[in-house]
UniProtKB/Swiss-Prot annotation:
Gene Ontology CC annotation, any one: nucleoplasm
Family: Belongs to the ELP5 family.
Protein name: Elongator complex protein 5
Keywords: Cytoplasm, Nucleus, Phosphoprotein, tRNA processing
Phylogenetic placement of the source organism: Eukaryota, Metazoa, Chordata, Craniata, Vertebrata
Pathway recorded for this protein: tRNA modification; 5-methoxycarbonylmethyl-2-thiouridine-tRNA biosynthesis
Length: 300
């Protein structure tokens, strides 16, 4: 599943941390898209172009269209090749394309943009870019669009992260144990239940993706890993686990609605000095002798 993240298109969110960096996985997915013949655009904001291209062979580098916003993010040099609106201008320009060739757009990084731009504006542009191939009237002329966004989750609060998460068709949360990297993949398909999967992997020196066997690779129903599970037995008003003595005491207890033979005899037997009552029935001509309700004319 990790090697087919871009098959569905849309926004793919790569959530990394200080312990488990995600740029290597981003470059591995970029290389895979380039080898598949897709147009690959890189919006480089966080590292230099030389650093990002390092490790790729010349064939891969020639297929990448790199937009450098690292050296001059505000376009102070007024270069002709720079987009006037910066990274957002580049994304908006890609919304106007009519090329049927599939396109992969890599944002390195989404955190850099989120720290400098309004969250609502960024989300609107990302939604427009990642859904342009599904717009009415454009499905026959515009190819599939995949947006890879590298997000440093620890730099942002739950609000912006939740907003980006709601836009993403696929979320990849990086983790691992004992030096082995893992990817928790949450995939949202149209008209289907979300599924999540954990895959173990490693990145080779040439940024090829090497999938490895892990303890759990089967797809499961979605459960958010960031929300702790709730124990339904925490706030009960009764004890679920009884000792042997408590169970015997419970079984010997007679509840108010349970009538034993002794209790029934005690209720029916008149006590000394207790007043007794009698029922008198005097039928008349208008009595309704209904066998199903024989007591409807009683005078007590």
């Amino acid at each position: 599943m990790l090697d087919s993240l871009l098959a569905l298109g849309g926004l793919v969110l790569l959530r990394d941390s200080v312990e488990w960096e995600g740029r290597s996985l981003l470059k591995a997915l970029v290389k895979k898209s380039a080898l598949c013949g897709e147009q690959v655009h890189i919006l480089g904001c966080e590292v230099s172009e030389e650093e990002f291209r390092e490790g790729f062979d010349s064939d891969i580098n020639n297929r990448l269209v790199y937009h450098d916003f690292f050296r001059d993010p505000l376009n102070w040099s007024k270069t002709e090749e720079a987009f006037p609106g910066g990274p957002l201008g580049a994304l908006r320009a890609m919304c106007k394309r009519t090329d049927p060739v599939p396109v992969t757009i890599a944002l390195d990084s989404l955190s850099w943009l989120l720290l400098r731009l309004p969250c609502t504006t960024l989300c609107q542009v990302l939604h427009a870019v990642s859904h342009q191939d599904s717009c009415p009237g454009d499905s026959s002329s515009v190819g599939k669009v995949s947006v890879l966004g590298l997000l440093h989750e620890e730099l942002h609060g739950p609000g912006p992260v939740g907003a980006l998460s709601s836009l993403a068709q696929t979320e990849v949360t990086l983790g691992g144990t004992m030096g082995q990297a893992s990817a928790h993949i949450l995939c949202r398909r149209p008209r289907q239940r979300p599924t999540d999967q954990t895959q173990w992997f490693s990145i080779l020196p040439d940024f090829s993706l090497d999938l490895q066997e892990g303890p759990s690779v089967e797809s499961q129903p979605y459960s958010d890993p960031h929300i702790p599970p709730v124990d339904p037995t925490t706030h009960l008003t009764f004890n679920l686990h009884l000792s042997k003595k408590e169970r015997e005491a419970r079984d010997s207890l007679i509840l108010p609605f349970q009538f034993s033979s002794e209790k029934q005899q005690a209720l029916l037997r008149p006590r000394p000095g207790q007043a007794t009552s009698h029922i008198f029935y005097e039928p008349d001509a208008y009595d309704d002798l209904d066998q199903e309700d024989p007591d409807d004319d009683l005078d007590i």
